[in-house]
A protein has these predicted regions:
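Terminal targeting signals and extreme-terminal segments of soluble enzymes
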Residues: 1-149
């Protein structure tokens, strides 16, 4: 699988480069707020997000729930796919591989890179790490370009 070359990040703070659509989507995203997810960086084709881990995010063994990792990868991947574009990107498909247990970590960080941007679909690879940069999961997410008619 050929990776798309990463674009240079525009200068300025995250809030300066976060486009109007991203701000509106972020303000309306109640689910993201409920699971305490923060998007910390976004530009067309790339995004970073994190969750500060609390007992609410873990199972009885103290391991971050798989659904939390999946939700983080889906949201961060979707942010990468939609930032700078004038259409929504609902998820069509997602595959995640859980590689290590997310245990004894203060936060989880997801980095998503768009690897394909076609007319109708975007595909993003998302890697999720713990606070020590240990790779916990790898996901491939596909999004449909829901254009206005």
């Amino acid at each position: 699988m050929e990776k798309k070359e990463e674009t240079k990040q525009p200068s300025g703070s995250f809030s300066e480069v976060w486009d109007k659509r991203g701000q509106e989507t972020d303000a309306a995203n109640d689910f993201r707020k409920k699971i305490e997810m923060e998007i910390t960086e976004a530009r067309p084709g790339y995004a970073v997000g994190e969750i500060v881990v609390t007992p609410w995010h873990t199972n009885i063994e103290g391991i971050v729930h798989g659904c939390v990792l999946y939700s983080l990868s889906d949201t961060v991947g979707g942010t990468a796919a939609m930032t700078g574009r004038d259409y929504a990107v609902p998820t069509v498909d997602g595959t995640i591989h859980y590689l290590k247990a997310g245990k004894n970590t203060s936060k989880i960080i997801a980095r998503a890179q768009e690897i394909q941007n076609g007319y109708a679909f975007s595909v993003c690879e998302c890697k999720i790490y713990d606070d020590k940069e240990t790779l916990l999961a790898s996901a491939t997410m596909t999004y449909y370009h829901l254009r206005k008619r």
